Amino acid sequence: MANIFIGNSIPPYRIDTYNVLAKMGFSMYFYSDRDPDIVNMDALLELCEFKPTYLQGKQLGRMSRTICFGLWGIIKKEKPKVIIVPEFQIVLWQILILKWLTCSKFKIISMCDDSYDMIANDNDFSRVHKWLRRLVPRLVDDIILLDVKAKDWYQEHFQKGIWLPILRNDDLESDKYRKVLPRSIEIAAHYGLSTTKVILFVGRLVKVKNVSGIIEAYARMTEHCKLVIIGDGEEMNDLQALASSISKEVLFLGRIEGEELRAWYNIADVFVLLSTLEPYGAVINEALLAGNRIVISQKAGACCLVSKDNGEIVDPYHIVETANALDRQVRMAGDKKEIRFRPSLMKVSFQERMNYLMQRLQRIRLGL
């Protein structure tokens, strides 16, 4: 007998959580053996402490619109007490129908990426998603949410909601950042950044990430620093043209992942995420674990990880406000005499959240 977890794919920022779920007795099922944002998937799979099983199905456009085959056979085999499903996707409705048709007793938990901004400011993916937000909580036993304010909203309206932000294992990540420090020192020397303050952005270069807003805010800053942009996407050429029009240098590095990316987090002093639509923003956890101070959009779910102790939350449409916040955070990062290992600035513990999840799942299994 095992519980069942169903996910889209295996992104690097969820590996630690998935490993814990497997240890808690979940069989791990996924739509795909590839994550569209990861190049070296084989290296990522080596970090899995479980054997993933890939579902057969028919994809109707995006991966999230997948009709899965053989679900009843899996349920009969595993005999689960709990099934965790992704968001409000087709597989949720398949599981609900199977439960109703067979009068099964297993509990259903949906993992939902809603940020509070999406809920409160009508900043949704679609009208359908907005409608489903009102329906699905009435049909499932609980909902796992990334944003603590979104969790509070679900608790208020449906008396359901488990806060589980995307977090990496603090201790494991600390060791990894320390391990790549020699590479960080080497890279910083190559680019002349050993004693220069660095503002870092990591992500897709698409409109909702508002990288143009970051460049415009950087142009208005008074503190001496360098903006480094890691990522690729459809806006690359336009962003490079914008960067060439300002009087400061912007370093575009393209797509980087794995240890090389960790090395850049060690080099950075301030991390910026200025998205206009961002359900969460897993990069914020990565940056905080590396000791980066944060300037984050109030639209991002991960702003629940940021306080005055480790950064600032800004309106992504206010460029002057963002520039001032970046100046303040660069100053608060202190003098930079060398590239060194820094303690984490995370205020939320991975193990604490996993222990909380374990307790909640036990209560759900018991029907409490």
Where are these regions (language model features)?
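Membrane-proximal helix-turn-helix segments that form the acceptor-binding/catalytic region
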Residues: 93, 101, 126-143
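Short hydrophobic beta-strand element within catalytic cores of glycosyltransferases
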Residues: 293-296
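Aromatic "clamp/platform" in nucleotide-sugar-dependent glycosyltransferases that forms part
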Residues: 276
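Conserved acidic donor-binding segment of nucleotide-sugar-dependent glycosyltransferases
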Residues: 308, 312-320, 327-333
